[in-house]
Design a protein with these regions (language model features):
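Membrane-proximal basic amphipathic "stem/tether" segments
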Residues: 265-324
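N-proximal low-complexity "stem/linker" segments adjacent to membrane-targeting elements
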Residues: 1-30
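Short aromatic/hydrophobic "clamp" motif used to bind/position activated sugar donors
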Residues: 106
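Active-site-proximal specificity loops/subdomain of glycosyltransferases
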Residues: 48-100
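Active-site acidic Asp-centered loop
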Residues: 109-110
Length: 324
C-alpha cells in the first residue's frame, strides 16, 4: 500500500529563533518549510512553536504559538545551583502539534532539520514483519540513527532512540509525545553539598532515555523505571532489541531524506550510535529470518571501529568513577 502525501501532516516543532541555551541557524525553519513543500507536495504543514517567536515570512498551513513552559530543572550541582533541560518545551511543541493533525499519518521534525527527499514514506512499509508479542505501535515508526545510541561509556545501553525525526501513524506518534510534563526537581537540603539528579551518585540517564522510559512505561507497565544511564540486564536488553525490531524502522539520515544542520553532522559514523545494518540484523533475528545481513557486514563498516574505541571508552569511564 502506497501512502498519498495528502494523507500526511508534518509537525515542525521547536523555536524558530535562537534563545538562551539553544542556538539556531538563521533561516533554517524557512528552509525546513520549503523542503516539505518540495518533497511532500500536498502534505499539511503545522508549525508548533512559542509565543513571542518571530514567525514573519513563514507560511505553514497551521501556526501554533504555544505558551512556553520554560526549561525544566533536572539537577543541582554541589553548590546547589540548578541544571535545566528543555524537556517540557519539546513535549509541548511536539504533542500540541500532533493533536492538530487530522490526517492518518504524521511526521515529527525539529525546526532546525529539513527534508532532502521523501524516501522515508516508502521505507515505513518496506519492513512489514513484526514480532507479535512485542508490538506496541499499530504500524512501524521511522526514526533516525543520528544520536540513537546503542552504547555509552563503552557499555550497551537501552532506551536511547533519536528524537530528531519520526514518521508513522499519527496515533503512534502521539503514543510517543503525548506524555505528562516533567516536574522541576526539588532541592533536597539533606543532600546539600552533593550533586542531586536522577540516578545519583551513578551516571544519570541521557535526556532521550528519560523521554523514552516515560512513554514506554506508559505503553507497557512491565518496563522498569530507568534509574541511571547504564541500567541493564540480559532480559531488558532483549526486550529493547525486540521492541526496536518490531516497532521501528531505523534509517540513516540519507536513507530517510533528512537534512541535518552542520553541528549534527559527524566527520564519520559514531561507533556508539546504532546504524541501519544493526537494525537490519535485529529485524532478521526477531522478525524476518530471510533478510540478507550478517555480523560480518556490520564489522566491515562500523564494527571494527567499535572494537577499537569502546574498550577505551569503558576504561576511561571506570577511571572517572574511581576518581569520584
Amino acid at each position: 500500500m502506497s501512502i498519498d502525501f495528502k494523507d500526511i501532516s508534518v509537525v515542525i516543532q521547536g523555536p524558530v529563533q535562537a534563545y538562551q541555551g539553544r542556538s539556531q541557524e538563521p533561516g533554517i525553519t524557512h528552509k525546513c518549510i520549503a523542503s516539505i513543500r518540495t518533497h511532500l507536495p500536498g502534505a499539511t504543514i503545522i508549525l508548533s512553536t512559542w509565543e513571542g517567536q518571530d514567525c514573519h515570512g513563514l507560511n505553514p498551513d497551521i501556526l501554533l504559538l504555544n505558551k512556553d513552559p520554560g526549561a525544566t530543572i533536572v539537577s543541582y550541582n554541589a553548590k546547589g545551583e540548578p541544571g535545566k533541560l528543555n524537556f517540557n518545551r519539546q513535549i509541548v511543541s511536539s504533542a500540541e502539534g500532533l493533536k492538530q493533525v487530522t490526517t492518518p499519518y504524521a511526521v515529527k521534525i525539529r525546526s532546525d532539520n529539513f527534508l532532502t527527499s521523501n524516501d522515508f514514506v516508502a521505507a515505513q512499509q518496506a519492513f512489514p514483519a513484526r514480532n507479535d508479542a512485542s508490538k506496541l505501535f499499530t504500524q512501524k515508526v521511522v526514526t533516525n540513527t543520528s544520536y540513537f545510541r546503542r552504547y555509552a561509556d563503552g557499555q550497551k545501553i537501552v532506551m536511547l532512540p533519536s528524537d530528531f525525526f519520526h514518521f508513522g501513524l499519527t496515533e503512534d506518534l502521539l503514543k510517543i509525545w503525548d506524555i505528562p510534563l516533567f516536574p522541576d526537581r526539588e532541592f533536597d537540603p539533606t543532600k546539600a553539598g552533593s550533586p542531586q539528579y536522577r540516578g545519583a551518585p551513578k551516571v544519570g540517564p541521557h535526556a532521550e532515555q528519560i523521554y523514552c522510559n516515560a512513554w514506554l512505561r506508559k505503553l507497557d507497565s512491565t518496563v522498569p523505571y530507568l534509574q541511571h544511564r547504564h541500567q541493564n540486564s540480559p532480559e531488558l536488553l532483549a526486550y529493547w532489541e525486540r521492541f526496536i525490531a518490531s516497532n521501528l524502522v531505523v534509517l540513516e539520515p540519507e536513507q530517510i531524506g533528512l537534512g541535518l544542520i552542520q553541528r549534527f553532522i559527524p566527520k564519520s559514523k559514531r561507533p556508539n550510535e546504532i546504524c541501519h545494518q544493526d537494525w537490519l540484523l535485529l529485524y532478521k533475528q526477531y522478525c524476518d529470518p530471510s533478510i540478507a545481513i550478517s555480523k560480518f557486514d556490520i564489522f566491515k563498516t562500523i564494527g571494527w571501529k567499535r572494537m577499537c574505541k569502546l574498550p577505551f571508552s569503558y576504561i576511561k569511564h571506570q577511571l572517572t568513577q574511581i576518581k569520584k
